[in-house]
Amino acid sequence: MPRARNLIIGCDGTWNDTAGIERTNVPKLLNACATRHQIVHYEEGVGTAYLEALPGGIYGKGLDRQILGAYRFLRKRLNESGWASAQQNIFIFGFSRGAYAARRLCGLINHSGIPYRARDVELGWQMYLNQDVYSASHLQTNGRFFSTTIKFLGVWDSVKSTIDPDYADLTLSPCVRKACHAMALDEQRKPFPVLRFNASQRVNQQWFSGVHSDVGGGYPEPDLSDITLKWMIDQSWAEGLRLKASAVRALKPNPAGVLHNSLTGPWQSLGRKIRRVRKEDVVHESVRARCVEVASYRPRNASQWLNEFSDLA
């Protein structure tokens, strides 16, 4: 009887892939995964293919490709002979619009299940898009699809295109056992509102210092993004993800590192909006460490949280 194995999916952010020198936390985490009894699948970000470059960046065109690519991977692997579905643990990661794609993938799996046959992949997708509960239930009862659970969902600063329809975006899919979400405290681009989860005991959602790619990775200086990567590694390791010790040791998280300005160039003309930190939100301990080490760093949207510390007020 074979041991359990992990199926690991990574959906990268807009205009991100593994060809660039500066990689996001998605491929970094996948590359840190041990290879024994683990299979990794990577979906490059929307806008990386030539014909979807501009619409992918602006409107999120290409999300269907990411979702269906990952869905086909799961269908193939979960149906391989010698492996029962219960022996296979699913881990899904995503950044930016890739995080939104990862969340939609979870919604698809929860609604339609996994098809036994490759030709039913598109059917499962259409049932999800149409929210066709009757057909999904009927096809699972008749043995064309089967249900499964997702052990861990890890996302960095989820955003979506404003033209994308809503599919319970704020609610964690019931098939997901645990989710973690790292949110960018200092991102101010109006077209990049964070798509947070509603409060749930299964969701660990925290604010981190930095703009969008300081949190999700992609800048030459990984000081801040290594903080969130290490956090995500720790959270997923606790759920059974196996990682290379050398890759973890290579991280250099630094709360006092470079914090970039994303509100430059054409983004300035699209507007500015400071993200709201709610009273019940969790702010990661590294934010306080940055406030201590960088005297000029006092995020206005976290003023209520800062007031809890007399030495930072």
Which residues does each PLM region occupy?
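Active-site- or binding-pocket-proximal scaffold segments within functional domains
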Residues: M1-A313
